[in-house]
Amino acid sequence: MREILFRGKRIDNGEWVSSGNLITFNDEGEGKQFFIPQMNAKCTCTHDEQDNIISFDSGMFYKVDPETVGQFTGLTDKKGKKAFEDDVIKHHFSDEIGVIRYGEYRNPFGDDIFGGHAGFYVDWVTGENPELLRKDLGYWMKIVEILGNIHDNPELLGGER
């Protein structure tokens, strides 16, 4: 079975946290908020008549910046490091730099005939011909290294995005 993990950067101190759960809470005053619980944390919630959560005890939860939230891909790089959305990877044979993304994508060859794909993929951003590289993440993970992520290390993208 695939390991489900989310990570995000804490708003209070900037530390990265991860857990198997991600909770979104819509606060009328502050808008949508994102929380990642401590591992094995228990939660006490208050519900309204429609069973919507209207409040919860957030003592065991970390409020995280929504822009930094990413899911674990289920894959590791060539050194065994877990790969998450928004990680920056490097292909050492050609020095190509890419970002792990989630969504719909098309590979450069054959997808006009067979259609597109959906899931985790590599958005290649630097190199001689990044648009010619295939994007399916699983193809690359055993031969690339995770260098960082777009939130802590934007300089890794070479000013391209």
Question: Where do the PLM segments sit?
Answer:
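Secondary-structure transition motif
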Residues: M1-R161
